[in-house]
Amino acid sequence: VLNAADPLVVGMRKYCDGSVTFFARDPDNAVVREHLSTGGRAAYVRDNSVILAEGDAETVLVSLERVPLTHGGLVPFQVDNVLAASAAAWAAGLPPDAIARGLATFRAGVGHAPGRFNLFAIDGLTIVADYGHNVSALNRLLSVLAAFPHEKRSIVYSAAGDRRDVDIIAQGEMIGRHFDRVFLYEDTYLRGRKDWEIANLFKQGISLGDRTKEVYPIKGSLAAILRATETATPGELLVVQPDTIDDGIAFWNVIQSRGGREITMSEAVACDVEIRESRFGRAAHAGRAFAPGDVVVKGRGPVIRERTKYTIQIDRDLH
């Protein structure tokens, strides 16, 4: 099972003794189309549904709206994971209905996927827990966080000691461009590095950014996470990278004991609104200024000129 969207992975095809199944979010991916034209297998997304294809035959496996891990298809890297898992299960001989049931019942929370883009809320604070420890993982995470409305952002982060200096510094620079407060921890995976050597490399990178104002080196993953949580303010976004999955579970237990709860992506990206009276009746007003490109509301269905109680006004004459 190979990622058709990554040229380096596509090149591994020549080393595969068995049959190859490709996956890609884009149904028009050139590698996927070429592979299908020769009768090969592929998994991709069309109309927000997972498709299993072999040659010209397509099977609609499941809508991403029914796959909790992807948060309705809003988290691209989790969609990739679902495509890869679906392709692997299919190649192993599982029937499509069994694969679909598995995807629909595998949750995005701590119980099924601890440390893999778990979302929490507590006392007005939104928390994202993700275990990614490298440039690629951080880049993908940041692309998803761009949809979050939170203005103030903090992160708890580190890296294993066997990462290259240039990669640690690069992660620091990315963090320095996206977060106001940074909590750097050192814990389990020094792997030959001296104490605080990793944190100092991160600081080099953070200094290249233009956003971070506060940096706190802290010994221990869980200690750093708790410090960040206890000093956060309502309305803030806190990104937490546990040092180990066990730390992630321990953190969730603390959050739960204090009244926190797991939330969905839709809840996490929702903007604060106020309900006010207007000449049209009660109306929702944004609780903050929107930026260009922000999604205000989503709806499905045809655009019509008649106003009904089931329509949303999107222009002066369109509903």
Segments (PLM) and residue ranges:
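Phosphate-binding loop of NTP-binding sites
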Residues: 2-4, 8-18, 310, 314
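ATP-dependent carboxylate-amine ligase
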Residues: 64, 75, 87-97, 101-319
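Asparagine-centered polar/low-complexity signal
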Residues: 3, 78-81, 134
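A short glycine/serine-rich beta->alpha loop
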Residues: 69-76
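Residue-level signal for inorganic ion chemistry
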Residues: 1, 20, 81, 85, ...
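Extended acidic/charged loop-beta regions that coordinate divalent cations
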Residues: 10-68, 105-120
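Glycine-rich nucleotide phosphate-binding loop and flanking beta-alpha elements
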Residues: 7-10, 29, 190, 246-247
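G-domain G4 guanine-recognition motif of GTPases
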Residues: 1-5, 25-26, 185-191
